[in-house]
Amino acid sequence: FDWSCTDISKINSKFKLEKYIILFPFCSPHLHLKKWPHYNELIKLIKDELKNEYKVVIAPGPNELEEAQNFNAECILDNGKALKIPQLSSLIKKSSFVVANDTGPAHMSAHLGVKGIALFGSHTTAYKVSIEREKFKAIQVADLKKLSARKVFEKIIL
């Protein structure tokens, strides 16, 4: 999937992206059961426990710009607009780690060979969607609301 990447040096410079963890806390509007509700707690843990060594970023899609304001992470945009797919691929590829709901960017991350985890509730299984790879794993739980930020944080391997 590396073929999908493009040069994002201007975006990297603008946002001073060197070491960063990218989160995808979004999901399809009609599939809210895929959404893990503890991303802000995870962001706080990452910032506190890792002493701000890693920037925490999100990259919302075109219909997620308003929702992105609810997260205490830096929002990566291109001139105020959502990144295009090749830009998103490059942002993911250069990341230190990815944490995502079961979304398109989670599957992109798995196929780009980056380190990360996807969070699955009862809507489907990681096995059924074949998301796990050597560096990309899944956390499967019956109820995403009961999956703590601490448990997710402990799975982050940098």
Question: Which ranges hold each PLM region?
Answer:
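Mid-sequence helix-capping/hinge segment at a functional interface
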Residues: 1-32
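Alpha-helical elements of Rossmann-like donor-binding domains used by nucleotide-donor carbohydrate transfer enzymes
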Residues: 10, 38-41, 70, 87, ...
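Short glycine-centered, acidic/aromatic-flanked micro-motifs in structured strand/loop junctions
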Residues: 25, 58-60, 141
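Short, well-ordered secondary-structure micro-motifs
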Residues: 33-35, 69-70, 129
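Donor-binding and catalytic core of enzymes assembling or modifying cell-surface/extracellular glycoconjugates
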Residues: 38-117, 121-124
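Nucleotide-sugar donor-binding patch of glycosyltransferase catalytic domains
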Residues: 107-158
